[in-house]
Amino acid sequence: MKKNLKYLLALCLTIALVFSLAACGQKADETPNDAQDDQQTEQEEFTPANYSIAALKGPTAMGLVKLMKDSESGETTGNEYTFTLAGSADEVTPALLKGELDMACVPANLAAVLYNKTEGEIEVLAVNTLGVLYIVENGESVQSMADLKGKTIVAAGKGSTPEYALRYLLTENGIDPDNDVTIDWKSEHSECVAALASGQASVALLPQPFVTVAQSKIEGLRMALDLTEEWKNLAGVEPVQ
């Protein structure tokens, strides 16, 4: 009886092992097919598209450099991109509202305005620049925000981040931006650089890379104040620009 029981147990174990191996073999056979089906599904779902993107000259467009290069060399997975660089946000907004652009890099405050104006049809995807604004001077008289009192500052970006950041910092440092300083607004940052180069201005509000460009052209031009650090000194936190 014990002998028969041993044979029965051995037979059961053998049958179980056979079914186990068969199941493993079936799973191994199915795995490549499943992977192939997933790959085919992904290929079927991907449809190359043409995208029209606009950005402002300067730091706003710097984040697009790699995409521009990849698009030019055909390394963008089949998608095609058309890029437009503008001098001011006013040049971008109409095209964006008309649907002539798929994406645009604009000042943060304008992004909020566009979101509300289109009732959410235009959405914010990302913030791609932080801490790029500087006060530059051809001289040594500006060592703090307080030293800007009585100065003329050439700047670009009226109605957007540069203006709001500058006015806030001036006000918080006891300087009335409407009466204690003169802000000469230009339409583009390149005009500020030209004013510095010609000697028409000695102090300017500039973002990178215009600061570096200006320093390469104008001997003695220095970064007098880092607005990121000035904001941090007041608020105790990093600014979101």
What are these model-predicted stretches?
Residues 19-23:
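C-terminal motif of bacterial Sec signal peptides marking the signal peptidase cleavage site
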Residues 25-27:
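Bacterial signal peptide processing site
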Residues 42, 50-51, 56-86, 90-91, ...:
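Short, polar/charged alpha-helical segment
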Residues 44-45, 137-153:
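Flexible hinge/capping segments at coil-to-helix
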Residues 53-57, 150-161, 173, 178, ...:
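Short beta-strand->loop
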Residues 66-68, 133-143, 235-241:
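A bilobed periplasmic-binding-protein/Venus flytrap-type ligand-binding module shared by bacterial periplasmic
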Residues 80-87, 105, 177-188:
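Short beta-strand-to-loop elements that line the ligand-binding cleft
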Residues 109-110, 118, 183-184, 190-241:
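Pocket-lining segment of extracytoplasmic ligand-binding domains
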